[in-house]
Amino acid sequence: NDFLAAEGPISMFDERVIKNYPSKGNLSVTCLLGDDVIYNEPMVKKNWILELGDTTIVGYNCKKASCNFRGRKWTVWYTLDIPISEGPWKIDGLPGMILKAVDSLNQFSFECFQIKTNLNIPMTVKVAKCIKTTALKVHKLKMLRESNYTAYSKLVGDDKGVIMGYVPK
């Protein structure tokens, strides 16, 4: 399957999320078992709690909010100066751009370090061969990778075709 992906290799712990506008839905690309896999999933509406607190990130005044998403409590800082309901990874849904997001266990942290505008530079993409799968299969493999990396790494043989739902060539 041909897929347009941003330049650069996808590492084993990397995930790219391409948001499908104007329709809703995420197209995610990640590396599992040594292959780039692709899957669709719906965009999930988050139940944000607007909190007291503000800060400045890359020159933008930001407000604080939090929500539970994917089993984690996320605290974010967003700016109304960029009225785009977007943010890092799959974190979105506020009235402004999310410039920082941290989970409560400090296992994941995203922070904007620079914003450039009016660059007039074309976006470059490269065609990558990706294996279509489902979000559920990817989730199960990620859970196995996190809980038992030895068992996960043994799947790199012929068994991975059965797990991912494809037959290797």
Spans of features found by a protein language model:
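Extended soluble regions of mature proteins
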Residues: 1-169
